[in-house]
């Protein structure tokens, strides 16, 4: 007999693993970047809306609160969450809003406060904890960490389910629920955690996520590695032949997505995706993915696109004067 925490854990020892390949919920790469790096080995194919790429706006908002952890709740953070809901509903009245807390009692406190506010609409608002958001999605997610130093200035919270086995998976689910924006409300800073707490995988990852949101909300660029090659590298690349600066525009690699081979920029603004018969085609699972699914995803995100193949290059048929 074998003792195991779950059927998933038991099956993982006997069956081949297949990685999730794509993410279609989030409008910006930054919203999925943390999970892609920590959970999916940067394998997720994701494409941001072209207008958001050109706006260079951060999808994150960080609200620092001097809250106190008392009786399993943080009143100061709850008040900040209620005010943030009010602001979102004024600026984006049609948005769905999901408030995600890290423990049940904080969720109940926020719900009670919201019920007492007549100007807050509850039709498109859901208040949940980290354990029951699987399958949900919202236009704007408001995270309420809740955990904070106590009245004596010590961080002694046990971090609930986050610190238990599988806690990082709950965190992964929670931070990937947003389609457009995330607001993180927290009383914690990196140096609040002690070394014993950081030995726990879930707590350590929470600290890393808080730092990530802080950095991106301040305008720091994403650290995007080169897309991994799962089949083979081609020795002759049309993409490498035609990329460069031309009169009035540039053709350049777009490292933020593997759904295109090159991006065309005019006066610093992304204007079009170029699809060649290079690595993107080789990495595709089939011709339908390369010639149907990729263009459909580009169209859905507002990217104009055109195909340009090696045969056209050898026949000296120019691409926009190239």
State the predicted function of each range.
Residues 301-320:
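Nucleic-acid nuclease catalytic cores
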Residues 17-60:
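Coupling/hinge elements of helicase-like and P-loop NTPase modules
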Residues 43-115:
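Conserved helicase/translocase motor-coupling segment
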Residues 4-5, 25-28, 78, 82, ...:
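Amphipathic alpha-helical transducer elements in NTP-driven molecular machines
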Residues 263-293, 311-313:
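Short beta-strand-loop-alpha-helix junction that forms the active-site gateway
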Residues 136-148, 156, 182-183:
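A short beta-strand element within the Helicase C-terminal
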Residues 103-104, 127-133:
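Conserved helicase motor
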Residues 1-14, 18, 36, 49, ...:
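Helicase C-terminal subdomain and adjacent C-terminal extension
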């Amino acid at each position: 007999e074998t003792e195991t925490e779950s059927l998933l854990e038991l099956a993982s020892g006997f069956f081949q693993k297949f990685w999730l390949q794509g993410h279609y919920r989030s409008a910006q790469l930054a919203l999925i970047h943390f999970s892609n790096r920590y959970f999916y080995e940067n394998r997720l194919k994701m494409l941001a809306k072209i207008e958001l790429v050109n706006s260079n706006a951060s999808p994150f908002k960080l609200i620092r609160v001097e809250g106190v952890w008392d009786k399993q709740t943080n009143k100061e953070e709850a008040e900040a969450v209620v005010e943030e809901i009010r602001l979102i509903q004024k600026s984006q009245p049609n948005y769905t809003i999901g408030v995600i807390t890290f423990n049940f009692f904080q969720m109940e406190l926020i719900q009670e406060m919201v019920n007492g506010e007549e100007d807050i609409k509850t039709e498109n608002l859901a208040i949940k904890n980290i354990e029951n958001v699987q399958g949900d999605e919202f236009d704007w997610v408001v995270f309420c960490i809740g955990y904070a130093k106590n009245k004596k200035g010590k961080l002694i919270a046990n971090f609930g389910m986050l610190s238990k086995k599988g806690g990082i998976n709950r965190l992964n689910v929670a931070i990937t629920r947003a389609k457009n924006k995330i607001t993180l409300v927290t009383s914690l800073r990196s140096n609040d955690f002690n070394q014993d707490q950081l030995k726990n995988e879930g707590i350590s990852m929470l600290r890393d996520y808080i730092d990530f949101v802080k950095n991106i909300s301040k305008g720091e660029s994403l650290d995007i590695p080169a897309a991994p090659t799962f089949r083979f590298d081609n020795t002759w690349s049309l993409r490498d032949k035609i990329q460069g600066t031309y009169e009035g525009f540039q053709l350049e690699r777009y490292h933020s997505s593997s759904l295109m081979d090159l991006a065309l920029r005019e006066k610093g603004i992304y204007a079009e995706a170029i699809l060649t018969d290079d690595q993107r085609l080789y990495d595709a699972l089939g011709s339908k993915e390369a010639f149907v699914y990729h263009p459909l995803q580009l169209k859905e995100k507002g990217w104009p696109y055109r195909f340009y193949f090696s045969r056209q290059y050898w026949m000296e048929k120019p691409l926009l004067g190239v």
